[in-house]
């Protein structure tokens, strides 16, 4: 099911996201903090792009009910995805 696959993808990405947050929290020097922050920023971009790509590739299966999975996406990732997500939703509406 699309919902289960989407939740699985989000869960796996959220695990990495948490590890990156932890590395920022655990940074001992300014340089470690800076590098950890850069890694997190890059990952947020990758995470949002992978969600977009997944959704776009499964567009014909996407329903409003499946979209409840997006409640699990961190806000910072959602903020990057939301503009592209509206394109997907508009396309889904046209298909149905």
What would you call each of these model-derived segments?
Residues 1-31:
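Short terminal alpha-helical segments
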Residues 30, 38-88:
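Acidic, low-complexity, intrinsically disordered interaction modules
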Residues 92-96:
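Short acidic DE-rich linear segments
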């Amino acid at each position: 099911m699309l919902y289960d696959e989407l939740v699985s993808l989000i869960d796996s990405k959220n695990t990495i996201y948490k590890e990156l947050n932890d590395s920022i929290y655990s940074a001992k020097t300014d340089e470690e903090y800076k590098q950890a922050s850069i890694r997190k920023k890059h990952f947020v971009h990758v995470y949002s792009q992978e969600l977009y790509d997944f959704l776009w590739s499964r567009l014909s299966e996407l329903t409003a009910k499946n979209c409840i999975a997006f409640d699990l996406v961190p806000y910072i990732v959602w903020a990057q995805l939301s503009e592209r997500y509206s394109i997907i939703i508009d396309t889904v509406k046209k298909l149905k």
